[in-house]
């Protein structure tokens, strides 16, 4: 009964954990790394066709985005997730595949001119569609038994529509252990979706720590703040452009704007138009509406019971085609434009920035995190000029940020979630946080709650039956392109060899009870291998 850490260890993205139990290989999350990448990830040490099934906490690409990649390499098992997560992954994994293929086409077009070898995308649309067909939707709080000796339950994590913490119970012979994977724990009092649900019993916890070193501070009145920004912008005769993540944040903005319109908080601009210009956001908004009864909070359900759609209103315009998108910029009336991507590095938002950044009447409002190196980050840090489509654009528009808006719990929310366990777990593994943040939050859990904690690096292997670390990996820093990659390759090769060693132990245990003559032949093979490579005399 082993837990192996693969991704989002001392890093925020690329969540992936491997459970080896009951003769099965199980993945919990299979995410794609996004943004800065500081450490090498250990490879999954089994053939991907030998993965029995995947348990998925939620649809964000840093948790789900590599599912098509493992499908491309042989995985054909079911992916268990909540119903809403299954539906969101249908659109998000197809969108991710489109991006992979578009990037590969662009790089190959450029590379051919330079004589470079062909760039192969991580996966194709066929791979995405293949794994999407294998999703199995599960209701919240219903126990499922995907394999003998293994049961699981999805509990609302309050982070995104359909997001979940996963309670995994494993029974091997006379040993039973309960492992809770927190997933991404949501912020309280988010619009539309419910607050995180607490769990109370676990032998082991694998816990995120995204904001494990900071507080969001006091939450502003978002409706009041947004209405004031709209009022000031429209009074200048300008447009309000909101770069927004297509899934989650866009629907929150629609929720706020519906209330602003219903309460008449913007004066002199009755019936103002709101354009949502993102095909992915439009599909996601439909899915939100389809899952209102299992995912929406009390306030949203009160509106629905009154016959009010909490994320729709008069004046809402949906752009589907590229012609729809282009026509927005011919509308001379003051308006709100919500478009992806949220960090302004891709998508239709770049066209809207080109048409609106130069005009001092307009406002660009950021409602989400802007990573270092993105166009969005440059704008909030005061760039006077930026490049769009290879052309310089002067920044004259007002640049604003909506503070404190986050789908992640802050350090206090994380501690509240951890405090809910009625008995101390045997171990808490702190993951999904920046390098030092994981260590800081692990120490707080120890100092304030008395928990035995560990912030593992990728490649760490833990025996859950005996509560002992079998192998504690060291973080292997990714070398910059200008540096020699020799040391990195050596470290990666050793980690791979070590992982195969642990796999060999698993294979040996599987052969218990086989005929003696087969065991003797197996022993000779292993002995020969050890004799060949034993370096103790060198």
Give the location of each predicted region.
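His/Asp/Glu-rich metal-coordinating catalytic cores
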Residues: 1-55, 60, 64, 71-252, ...
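Short secondary-structure boundary/capping segments
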Residues: 94-99, 103-107, 221-223, 256-261, ...
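A polyampholytic, Gly/Pro-enriched intrinsically disordered region
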Residues: 100-105, 292-305, 387, 470-494
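Short, surface-exposed amphipathic charged segments that create phosphate/polyanion-binding patches used
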Residues: 150-154, 287-295, 415-416, 465-477
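Hard-cation-handling environments
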Residues: 229-374, 387, 437-439, 444-447, ...
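C-terminal, active-site-flanking charged/polar segments
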Residues: 359, 434-478
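Generic long, charged, amphipathic alpha-helical segments
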Residues: 387-418
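Charged, amphipathic alpha-helical linkers/stalks
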Residues: 459-518
């Amino acid at each position: 009964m082993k837990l192996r850490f693969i991704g989002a260890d001392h890093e925020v993205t690329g969540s992936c954990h491997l459970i080896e139990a009951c003769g099965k290989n199980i993945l919990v999350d299979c995410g794609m790394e996004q943004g800065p990448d500081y450490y090498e990830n250990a490879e999954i040490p089994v053939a991907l066709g030998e993965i029995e099934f995947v348990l998925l906490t939620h649809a964000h690409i840093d948790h789900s985005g590599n599912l098509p990649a493992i499908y491309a390499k042989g995985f054909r098992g079911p992916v268990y997730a909540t119903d809403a997560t299954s539906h969101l992954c249908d659109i998000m994994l197809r969108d991710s595949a489109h991006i992979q293929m578009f990037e590969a086409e662009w790089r190959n077009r450029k590379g051919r001119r330079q004589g470079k070898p062909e760039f192969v995308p991580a996966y194709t649309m066929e791979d995405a569609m293949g794994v999407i067909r294998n999703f199995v939707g599960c209701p919240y709080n219903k126990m499922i038994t995907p394999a003998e000796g293994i049961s699981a339950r999805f509990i609302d994590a309050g982070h995104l529509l359909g997001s979940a913490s996963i309670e995994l119970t494993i029974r091997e012979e006379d040993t039973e252990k309960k492992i809770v994977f927190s997933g991404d724990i949501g912020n309280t009092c988010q619009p539309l979706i419910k607050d995180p649900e607490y769990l109370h019993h676990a032998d082991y916890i694998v816990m995120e720590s995204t904001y494990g070193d900071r507080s969001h501070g006091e939450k502003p009145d978002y409706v009041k703040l947004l209405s004031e920004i709209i009022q000031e912008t429209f009074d200048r005769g300008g447009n309000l452009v909101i770069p927004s993540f297509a899934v989650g944040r866009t629907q929150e903005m629609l929720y706020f704007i519906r209330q602003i319109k219903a309460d008449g908080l913007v004066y002199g601009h009755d019936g103002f138009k709101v354009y949502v210009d993102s095909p992915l956001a439009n599909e996601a908004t439909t899915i939100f509406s389809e899952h209102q009864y299992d995912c929406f909070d009390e306030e949203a359900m009160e509106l629905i019971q009154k016959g009010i759609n909490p994320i729709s209103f008069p004046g809402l315009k949906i752009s589907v085609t590229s012609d729809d998108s282009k026509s927005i910029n011919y509308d001379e009336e003051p308006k709100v434009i919500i478009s992806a991507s949220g960090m302004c590095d891709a998508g239709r938002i770049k066209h809207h920035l080109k048409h609106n950044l130069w005009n001092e009447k307009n406002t660009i409002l950021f409602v989400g995190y802007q990573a270092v190196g993105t166009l969005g980050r440059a704008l909030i840090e005061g760039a006077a000029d930026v490049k769009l489509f290879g052309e310089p654009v002067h920044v004259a528009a007002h640049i604003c940020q909506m503070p404190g808006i986050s789908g992640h719990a802050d350090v206090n929310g994380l501690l509240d979630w951890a405090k809910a366990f009625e008995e101390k777990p045997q171990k808490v593994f702190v993951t999904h946080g920046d390098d030092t943040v994981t260590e800081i939050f692990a120490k707080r859990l120890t100092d304030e709650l008395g928990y035995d904690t560990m912030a593992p690096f990728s490649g760490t292997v833990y025996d859950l039956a005996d509560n002992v670390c079998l192998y504690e990996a060291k973080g292997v820093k990714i070398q910059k392109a200008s540096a020699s990659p020799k040391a990195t390759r050596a470290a990666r090769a050793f980690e791979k060899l070590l992982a195969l060693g642990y796999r060999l132990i698993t294979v040996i245990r599987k052969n218990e009870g086989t005929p003696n003559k087969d065991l003797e032949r197996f022993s000779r093979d292993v002995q020969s291998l050890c004799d060949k490579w034993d370096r103790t005399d060198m």
